Amino acid sequence: MELTYTIKRSSRRRKLTITVERDRSVVVHAPESTSEEKIRAVVESKRQWIYEKTGHVQKYALPHPPGKEMVNGESALYLGRQYQIEMVRDGSEKIRFEQRFLIPAHLSDERRQVLRSWYMDRAKEKILPRARKFAVDLGVAFANARIVDNRYRWGSCTTRDNIRFNWRLIKAPMYVVDYVIIHELAHLLEANHTPRFWNIVRAQSPKMDKAKQWLLENGQILEEEI
């Protein structure tokens, strides 16, 4: 069976690596000068590993889970807990969070986008400062950090030392958020998922295994449309 994959080349990359995204797509990250023949040979040598990864329970195909109705009595996830949604008529212009989501009733037509924007704001407020803190702890420096809308990755670290985090992470428990932050920052010390890489992550994220298991079991819930 032929393997389909996308090649992404970079003049800054020194090693060839293969990743399997959460939509089961295979991406080969290669130095600029790597020949097609070498890439094919490496992919072929990793065929069994790729099959195992694409069949992993965490890799699931579109469509994504259906969204919520966003009405009174429903709940929405935030930092690992479900909180009730309440539509209120109090003249307010934005969502308030008081151990429940208080959403202005007059914004009901835009309530999905309003809650999505609220999540984005909370992600910027909580994730980015923690990224700066953990960078200091690890003794690394990144070019910039951003919260993005990325369907298939919780986080990423580019060859230009930019780090990106999926806004949906803000729905997960904080120890899971911290694990993803540390995971991406560790790539600034070790590009590949080597034993050294995992030792770095585990030293800073004692709950690494628990966090990975949480994402394995709950990742699809984070993907629910709002």
Where are these regions (language model features)?
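Active-site-proximal or metal-binding-adjacent scaffold patches in catalytic folds
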Residues: 1-179, 188-226
